[in-house]
Amino acid sequence: MKKVKKPLVFLTGLALCAALSLPQAESARAAATGSDPALAAALETLLRERPEIILDVLRQNSEAVLDIAQQGSNLRRKHNLEVQWRKDMENPKSVQLENRPVLGRPDARVRIVAFSDFTCHFCEQASKNVEALRKTYGDDICLIFKHLPLDEKGPGGIASSYFVAIAQQDEDKAWKFYDLMFSNRDRLLAEGEPFIKESAQNLGVDMKRLSRDVRSKKVSDILAEDQKDAQKLGVEGTPYFLVNDLVVRGALPLDLFRDAVEMARDGKKGAKP
């Protein structure tokens, strides 16, 4: 018997799974996997003679077919990430954490180190996911924010300098400033430093000290260390996270980010200072 063309039969099975009742769908799956050679051969012959059949089925069930394809894509992405993360766990990362404010318990089982930019849309999205994770895992998670603005002299870079400087006075106020920058990203982009100063003043920051600290060598050294850490890790864009030693690139969907936290929590301690 001639070997059945797998892509053709698989597409047939996909369409039939979307369109038919469960017993029929099981037969389609049997054909797609080759467990029923006679049925597979019959389907191949039919579709070669009447290819419009499968096109009609796909059109009539386009949403179901897309859902099936998306589920497969999501499973593949999850698998690829888990493979990467298992490798990451065997490759400890070292970054500078001294003099950085910590949101949460410093001895938390999972330390999330974020390389981010206050003006980045995807960073804003990712910050919401991190907050959701902190609510879910509580004291098991802490966050450290490292600065990687696209434009060091633009609003993102200026906001980074202010965050570090405010943290020298009061770490709680620095994290409130962090929230204000991300939640008002449009104003940050449009108004720049005047909005940044207004936000700091509204938080009750000592503005005279802030004006000195923001231009101090201590602040510039911390920001320079963040840049060096990013280069050492090969960070190519923001957001970028170390979840202990696991690397998370981009604004990963919350469910996948949660998978990284679960794996890190059950694995090794990471990201040594």
List each model region and its residues.
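Short acidic/histidine-centered micro-motifs embedded in hydrophobic/aromatic stretches
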Residues: 60, 180-184, 213, 217
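Structural alpha/beta surface segment adjacent to cysteine/selenocysteine redox centers
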Residues: 113, 124-201, 231-236
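Bacterial N-terminal signal peptides
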Residues: 11-21
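C-terminal cap of thioredoxin/glutaredoxin-like
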Residues: 2, 34-46, 64, 68-69, ...
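Bacterial Sec-dependent N-terminal signal peptides
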Residues: 1-11
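Extracytoplasmic thiol/disulfide redox context detector
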Residues: 19, 27-154, 221-232, 266-273
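Stable alpha-helical elements in mature extracytoplasmic
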Residues: 39-42, 50, 54, 126-129, ...
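Surface-exposed patches in mature extracellular/periplasmic domains of secreted proteins
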Residues: 55-58, 174-178, 209-213, 272
